[in-house]
Amino acid sequence: MPFKPLKLSVIAMVILYAVLMIPVTSWLNLLSMLFVRNAFESSQSELTQNALWVNMIVMAVIPPICEEFTFRGLYYNGYRQRGVWCAILGSALAFGLMHMNFNQFCYAFVAGIALGILLEATGSIFATMTAHFVVNGWSTAL
């Protein structure tokens, strides 16, 4: 598993990459809601009862670490011997399915592809954790 440290310039590019992912994933979520009601929206009201810092830890810090370790670490590396695209698509598919509903699958699968490409480009799981944190943190803060 690539735990290569990141230069400050790479971190800045990763943050920009993540910010550019946000409109794409938002659009896919909206598109998916044409077919199926978003199941996650109903549970979001429960989150508003917590302090923002609690929500940030629960939604934007812990999941990126655990999910990136699992999907871009274990799954990606398991599929990598079959080729880059098998690793990217296989880990993205597992990442999408883990979200367990159609709406989240749609954007999580595409985000998983973007994160797999980011892992391949940077060679560091810290890059995918950072990008995942930015995306989750953005939606949690809003």
Regions found by a protein language model. Give the residues of each.
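Hydrophobic alpha-helical transmembrane segments
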Residues: 11-15, 53, 57, 85-90, ...
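Hydrophobic alpha-helical transmembrane segments of integral membrane proteins
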Residues: 12, 16-21, 93-108
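Aromatic-enriched alpha-helical transmembrane segments of multi-pass intramembrane proteins
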Residues: 48, 84-86, 142
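Juxtamembrane helix-loop-helix connectors linking adjacent transmembrane helices
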Residues: 1-69
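Active-site His/Glu-centered metal-binding helix of metallohydrolases
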Residues: 65, 69-70, 74, 101, ...
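Membrane-interface helix/loop boundary segments of multi-pass membrane proteins
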Residues: 66-90, 117-124
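Functionally important transmembrane alpha-helices
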Residues: 92, 104-142
